[in-house]
Amino acid sequence: MAKILVLYYSMYGHIETLASAIAEGAQKVDGVEVTIKRVPETMPADAFAKAGGKTDQKAPVATPQELADYHGIIFGTPTRFGNMAGQMRTFLDQTGGLWASGALYGKVASVFASTGTGGGQEHTITSTWTTLAHHGFIIVPIGYGATELFDVSQTRGGTPYGATTIAGGDGSRQPSAEELAIARFQGEHVAKITAKLAR
């Protein structure tokens, strides 16, 4: 049984929604067990609430050490100035012991993201790949396998690097049906590859 972790950070719920769609897609693949977890919040609780952060996220909080228990990990993060959110950065910065032991070497990884206005969504994914490459992950983009990526009739997220959503400057825009379809495709695509490599 190939074990996949969908690991995310979400402040306002956009990445949480994409994470659910990613997991839904991954669960379509036979022989795969999917778990959704989130990284710890680093903001003080009162500051998080004052900023309008979503406090009712059901996914349990992960620890860095448990990453070694999975065959594949799909990371989700909002964009912060063109890079991953600080909460995800802080979590990954605690994986030095896993790097030293080679515990993540050869595992499958993929990345999805959210941006306010689209600025930095691709760079957020590809800059996250740098950290994953240092661990020796096999990085899986989605290419143009999702037909929704060819639709230019509306504003939407989605890249050949991974699923994305555009939240709007005030965070009011929720992931569209097309963005969720791309996320489901990513989950299924990564799960198929992980299942093959885990045999």
From Swiss-Prot:
EC id: 1.6.5.2
Keyword field: Flavoprotein, FMN, NAD, NADP, Nucleotide-binding, Oxidoreductase
Protein name: NAD(P)H dehydrogenase (quinone)
Domain Flavodoxin-like: 4-190
GO cellular component, one term: membrane
Keyword Signal: no
Residues reported in the UniProt entry to bind substrate: 99
Binding site for FMN: 10-15, 79-81, 114-119, 134
Domain of life: Bacteria
Binding residues annotated for NAD(+), in chain numbering: 12
SUPFAM superfamilies found in the cross-reference section: Flavoproteins
Molecular function terms, GO-annotated: flavin adenine dinucleotide binding; FMN binding; NAD binding; NADH:ubiquinone reductase (non-electrogenic) activity; NADP binding; NADPH dehydrogenase (quinone) activity
Catalytic reaction list: a quinone + NADH + H(+) = a quinol + NAD(+); a quinone + NADPH + H(+) = a quinol + NADP(+)
Cofactor(s) listed: FMN
InterPro entries, alphabetized: Flavodoxin/NO_synth (IPR008254), Flavoprotein-like_sf (IPR029039), Flavoprotein_WrbA-like (IPR010089), FMN_Rdtase-like_dom (IPR005025), NQO (IPR037513)
Cofactor mode of binding and number, as noted: Binds 1 FMN per monomer.
HAMAP family the record matches: NQOR
Entry's family note: Belongs to the WrbA family.
EC top class named in words: oxidoreductase
